[in-house]
Amino acid sequence: MSEFPKQAQVVIIGGGVGGASIAYHLTLLGWKDVVILEKHELTSGSTWHSAGLVGQLRSRANITQLLGYSVDLYKRLEAETGQATGWKMNGGLRLACNPERWNEVRRQATTAKSFGLEMHLLSPTEAQELWPLMTVDDV
């Protein structure tokens, strides 16, 4: 932009993931007069320091669905915008070191399945075959 606008329909303070997401979604809805105010570069604050982890399964359905939407958005964002996002779906690992935790992980697997999320229950030996550096003596 060559000149700073004198007015805007929407002014978003902060160009982190929250502000950028609000601007993105407003423009998808057809809003044309949206400005982000950021004191440095976009996503250079707390967003830049984040690990970028997006675990999808949560205890509340609405949050799980929102995170699923986020993953779908991140998957298509690079093709849609032409901007490299660096998005990679690597998965995660939940460990159970006692019977109570194992029961909890099994319940989570059932919940994940109900949301259409992929989750596999592995024995300690199977986990170690996938991650050889992992010590499984107490898993």
Regions found by a protein language model. Give the residues of each.
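Beta1/beta-strand and adjacent pyrophosphate-binding region of the FAD-binding site
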Residues: 3-18, 35
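Dinucleotide-binding Rossmann-like beta1-alpha1 core, especially the glycine-rich loop
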Residues: 52-133
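Short, intrinsically disordered, charge-balanced linker/junction segments flanking boundaries
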Residues: 135-139
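Glycine-rich FAD pyrophosphate-binding loop
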Residues: 27-48
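Short, flexible hinge/linker loops that cap or flank conserved catalytic cores
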Residues: 2-5, 28, 87
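Hydrophobic alpha-helical packing residues
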Residues: 26-27, 112
